[in-house]
A protein has these predicted regions:
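Membrane-embedded alpha-helical bundles of multi-pass transporters/translocases
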Residues: 1-192
């Protein structure tokens, strides 16, 4: 007797579309936040972080991003363990994803709201703290979300199909994030 799929094609597409949202957010941050805080060239944007270098080639912004990623590398296995061991009535994964939504929205918004509109050491500390909180928040969504994949497909063909849909959604998110440079001028000129 042939085993039926645990998740129909429509459900697979809906699940994979969840990748689109976090792909836009993560790629927007990775691709544009550096330009936002330390614009290059003759752009009309203000430099918001002092161009401090350590050892002559590591700048403050690199240290901010690196520190946030290091903390992310530590917290990801912790979140995975907590999700795996969860006994919540809504399931092992969904409660973590729901919990992550508001912190991701708040910290994602605050990343684009520096303390001052001018170059400031305070902006370095602000960005470091908010980026760490953002990375932890997004991990509370992404780690359990990705852990759902093996639970949806009963065989490698289904898992591969879902993973392919996720890759397509991720790529679309990357394209959307890459096309978002125009938002920078709006943000610095109008919102701050």
């Amino acid at each position: 007797m042939k085993q039926t799929e645990k998740l129909p094609l429509r459900g697979q597409l809906i699940y994979a579309s969840g990748t689109l949202g976090w792909s836009v957010v993560v790629n927007l941050l990775a691709g544009i936040i550096i330009y936002f805080y330390q614009p290059v060239g003759d752009d009309q944007l203000n430099n918001l972080i002092p161009k401090i270098t350590i050892l002559g080639f590591i700048n403050a912004l690199t240290l901010v991003v690196l520190s946030a990623r290091l903390i992310d590398a530590i917290i990801d296995p912790v979140i995975a363990h907590l999700s795996d061991k969860s006994g919540n009535k809504l399931g092992r994964r969904i409660p973590f994803m729901i919990f992550a939504l508001l912190p991701v929205l708040i910290t994602g918004f605050l990343l684009w709201m520096p303390l001052t509109r001018t170059e400031s050491m305070g902006n370095i500390w602000w960005l470091a703290g908010i980026q760490i909180l953002f990375n932890v928040s997004i991990s509370f969504y992404v780690i359990p979300y990705n852990a759902l994949l093996p639970e949806f497909g009963y065989n490698s063909e289904v898992k591969l199909r879902i993973s392919t849909f996720q890759s397509i959604a991720y790529t679309i998110g990357l394209v959307i994030a890459s096309a978002s440079n125009a938002l920078l001028n709006f943000n610095q000129d109008v919102l701050h």
